[in-house]
């Protein structure tokens, strides 16, 4: 349902962020990312990433946080963002709206990405071995992540549909939209929802590093593989930063190495 108050708030926040003086400086490389996790996690990750880019490219790089997936796509379309970490769906949306934009990099795991379905332990539902078992989620309170998330909504809904489960089959004939993968974990763990779907990497990271956040959860099913996250850049960066800049930018990103201590801190490589 359209919410005018939220739309106006989002619009005003977008205006205040994208009207900052940094956006009038053509020599600043502006980096963005879809907000698929808690903001403090994203801020740490992409500020470190921006510092690494700045160091290796010898240009000023600024990370610009956005409030939602739509803002990331909009910021890229209006050229207020130069380089954005998109998911599969949001990346397609951004490129369709931004002529000459290009995909410049992708992690190896993103070629074979997966989502997971999780359930609250109180349901006492056993994990399933094939897609047909998703029918067990009918009549439950179910939440996706963001509506524009590939791993948190698009692909999970696709697999649900393949199993004959539609949104109308959930309790209340609707699904929730938590806004992010971390929020999905929190909502199902608390019992606010019975089940949910999210990014497999975020799930595994929380299992390892935040066991309290997953204490009431069970893994229900892991999806088949699909293509997801990638870096998308504006097609005119060389007009601002010089000939060969895009190739150099691509090389820096692709040469990030998890085995290097300084690069390992950029959890973007493996999360």
Regions found by a protein language model. Give the residues of each.
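A ligand-binding cleft/hinge motif common to bilobed small-molecule-binding domains
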Residues: 85-98, 161-162, 187-190, 194-215
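A bilobed periplasmic-binding-protein/Venus flytrap-type ligand-binding module shared by bacterial periplasmic
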Residues: 115-126, 227-241
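A conserved helix-loop-strand patch within extracytoplasmic ligand-binding domains
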Residues: 107-163
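Ligand-binding cleft/hinge of the Venus flytrap
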Residues: 47-58, 146, 150-177, 205-212
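Extracytoplasmic "Venus flytrap"
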Residues: 28-46
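Short beta-strand->loop
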Residues: 100-110, 171-174, 206-226
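Conserved small/polar residues in nucleotide/adenosyl-binding loops
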Residues: 269-271
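Short helix-initiation/N-cap motifs at beta->coil->alpha
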Residues: 63-74, 87-89, 168-186, 227
């Amino acid at each position: 349902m359209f919410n005018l108050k939220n739309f106006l708030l989002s619009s005003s926040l977008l205006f205040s962020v994208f009207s900052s003086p940094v956006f009038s400086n053509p020599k600043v490389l502006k980096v963005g990312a879809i907000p698929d996790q808690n903001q403090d996690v994203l801020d740490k990750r992409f500020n470190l990433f921006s510092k690494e880019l700045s160091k290796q490219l010898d240009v000023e790089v600024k990370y610009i946080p956005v409030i939602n997936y739509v803002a990331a796509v909009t910021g890229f379309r209006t050229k207020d963002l130069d380089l954005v970490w998109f998911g599969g769906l949001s990346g397609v949306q951004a490129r369709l709206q931004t002529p000459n934009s290009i995909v410049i990099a992708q992690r190896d795991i993103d070629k074979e990405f997966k989502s997971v379905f999780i359930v609250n332990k109180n349901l006492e539902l056993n994990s399933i071995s094939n897609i047909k078992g998703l029918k067990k989620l009918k009549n439950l309170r179910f939440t996706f992540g963001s509506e524009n998330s590939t791993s948190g909504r698009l692909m999970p809904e696709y697999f649900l549909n393949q199993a004959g489960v539609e949104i109308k089959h959930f309790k209340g004939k609707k699904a929730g939209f938590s806004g992010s993968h971390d929020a999905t974990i929190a909502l199902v763990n608390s019992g606010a929802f019975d089940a949910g779907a999210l990014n497999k990497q975020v799930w595994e990271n929380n299992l390892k590093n935040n066991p309290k956040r997953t204490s009431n959860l069970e893994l229900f099913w892991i999806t088949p593989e699909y293509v997801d996250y990638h870096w998308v850049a504006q097609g005119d960066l060389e007009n601002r930063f010089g000939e060969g800049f895009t190739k150099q930018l691509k090389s820096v990103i692709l040469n990030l190495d998890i085995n290097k201590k300084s690069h390992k801190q950029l959890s973007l490589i493996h999360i």
